[in-house]
């Protein structure tokens, strides 16, 4: 059915309406469909014999051809002709915002709240910066009442200390595993919330889903009993230069990976998803609130 799906996609899509960045992303993701076959299906193909094995081999070969044909269309037709604008415009955005938030808060009100929060958070960042920089050689000025430039310089100097504590290129997933174990143990020790026994596994993000987010949490639905939750981490692309890799690891340093594990897994999305799936109402479990899920995950960052 996948070859037919690809063909229908090509028929339905008007390249001129597709935003360039969307086209480029899907063109990079497409080959990841084959990696799923190579990782999960082909290693187990030996379990089939006779006609069953022949049908599987034929299906895999048909899929390879379909993916290659679709890749050619993506590279030669979609990407070069993608002229769309990802912006949906003020009117549609305001309608979408109200439905998404289930609130009458306007964009201006949200912006005002956000700007006030930026001021508050930067004040906290400066306070912490003074604590970690006081007494250090070459520390910037750290007055009680800094001007904007002094505040910025102090925050940047403190962040450099965090950037320096970063995992190696091939150790991001292992670091995530360690931070997940630490966050889980902390939540239990502090009795913050009931920690579910549902299995959770950290995996490399499937290739066909890379290029959008660094990580995500894939929880089983309320009808999928006993299945694992996957906390997926996108690996650093093989073709990245040392400069690109260092820039990425400076941002996703050890402290940031701690925060990532809290948000995506414990006690963030993984925990919320596990409790949501247990709700007595199947309908409520199926119709989860994305706004609540993200709000909860961000809230737990502060709690932890």
Q: What are the functions of these language-model segments?
A:
Residues 1-304:
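N-terminal maturation segment of proteins
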